[in-house]
Swiss-Prot record:
Pfam families for the chain: F5_F8_type_C
Knocked-out gene: effects: No visible phenotype at birth. After two months, mutant males display a profound disorganization of the inner and outer nuclear layer of the retina, with increased extracellular spaces in the region of photoreceptor ribbon synapses and the appearance of gaps, and a decrease in the number of photoreceptor cell outer segments. The number of cone photoreceptors is reduced threefold. After three months, mutant males display a layer of small, cyst-like structures in the inner retina.
Main location: secreted
Gene Ontology molecular function: any one: phosphatidylinositol-5-phosphate binding
Tissue spec. comment: Detected in the eye cup. Detected in retina, in the inner segment of the photoreceptors, the inner nuclear layer, the inner plexiform layer and the ganglion cell layer (at protein level). Restricted to the retina. At the mRNA level, detected only within the photoreceptor cell layer, most prominently within the inner segments of the photoreceptors. Undetectable in the inner plexiform layers and the inner nuclear layer.
Name this protein carries in UniProt: Retinoschisin
PANTHER family referenced in this protein's UniProt entry, alphabetically: F5/8 TYPE C DOMAIN-CONTAINING PROTEIN, F5_8 TYPE C DOMAIN-CONTAINING PROTEIN
C-alpha cells in the first residue's frame, strides 16, 4: 500500500505542465549522471518513475523544466530554513540567520552567515512533504566578498532517519562547486534528482566566511 501511495504522488507530480522553465547551463555530454539516466516516455505512468525504497529517481524524463521552490518569492517560510548552532545567532548575527539564505536578497542581512567557519556547519530545508528536487542555485553575500566555494548535500525523508549523502557516479560523496564571486548565480543540477523532505547543504570550502543565498529547483515535466 505505501508504494501505491508513493506512485500516485509521483503521478500527480509529473502530471502538470511547468509554468516556469530554467534552462540548464551544464554540458550534458560531460555530466556523468546524464550518461546513467534513462529517458522515459511520459505516457508510461508513475510506476516507471518509482522503485521501491528509492530516494532518487532511477528513470525520469530528465527534468527538462525546473520550478523554483520559493526561497526568493517567500513561498518557503522562515520556519522551513534552519542551520547549525541557531542559539548562537544573537546580537549582530541575529540579522544573518538561516531564513536570510534567499536568492537575490539585498540589503543588510541579505544572506545566511555561519557564525563558525568549519565543515560541521549546515543549512537545512524542511520541504514539509516529500518533493522531487532537481537542482540548487547559490549566491554569496550581497554586500561583501564572502561566499561558499564548494559544498556537499545530504537528504532524508523522515527526521527519524539517518542523513544520506548525495553520491557521484563512483559512489563517493559528491562535491558541488559553488561560487567564485558574491553576485553570480551558480546552478548545480541533480542527476538523478532527490526524492526527499529534508535537504542539507554542508559547506566544504568558502571565501573569507560561509555565506549563502540560495534557491532549490523542483522537478517538473513538460508532459501534460
Amino acid at each position: 500500500m505505501p508504494h501505491k501511495i508513493e506512485g500516485f504522488f509521483l503521478l500527480l507530480l509529473f502530471g502538470y505542465e511547468a509554468t516556469l522553465g530554467l534552462s540548464s547551463t551544464e554540458d550534458e555530454g560531460e555530466d556523468p549522471w546524464y550518461q546513467k539516466a534513462c529517458k522515459c516516455d511520459c505516457q508510461v505512468g508513475a510506476n516507471a518513475l518509482w522503485s521501491a525504497g528509492a530516494t532518487s529517481l532511477d528513470c525520469i524524463p530528465e527534468c527538462p523544466y525546473h520550478k523554483p521552490l520559493g526561497f526568493e518569492s517567500g513561498e518557503v517560510t522562515p520556519d522551513q530554513i534552519t542551520c547549525s548552532n541557531p542559539e548562537q545567532y544573537v546580537g549582530w548575527y541575529s540579522s544573518w540567520t538561516a531564513n536570510k539564505a534567499r536568492l537575490n536578497s539585498q540589503g543588510f542581512g541579505c544572506a545566511w552567515l555561519s557564525k563558525y567557519q568549519d565543515s560541521s556547519q549546515w543549512l537545512q530545508i524542511d520541504l514539509k512533504e516529500i518533493k522531487v528536487i532537481s537542482g540548487i542555485l547559490t549566491q554569496g553575500r550581497c554586500d561583501i566578498d564572502e561566499w561558499v566555494t564548494k559544498y556537499s548535500v545530504q537528504y532524508r525523508t523522515d527526521e527519524r532517519l539517518n542523513w544520506i549523502y548525495y553520491k557521484d557516479q563512483t559512489g563517493n560523496n559528491r562535491v558541488f562547486y559553488g561560487n567564485s564571486d558574491r553576485s553570480s548565480t551558480v546552478q548545480n543540477l541533480l542527476r538523478p534528482p532527490i526524492i526527499s523532505r529534508f535537504i542539507r547543504l554542508i559547506p566544504l570550502g568558502w571565501h573569507v566566511r560561509i555565506a549563502i543565498r540560495m534557491e532549490l529547483l523542483e522537478c517538473a515535466s513538460k508532459c501534460a
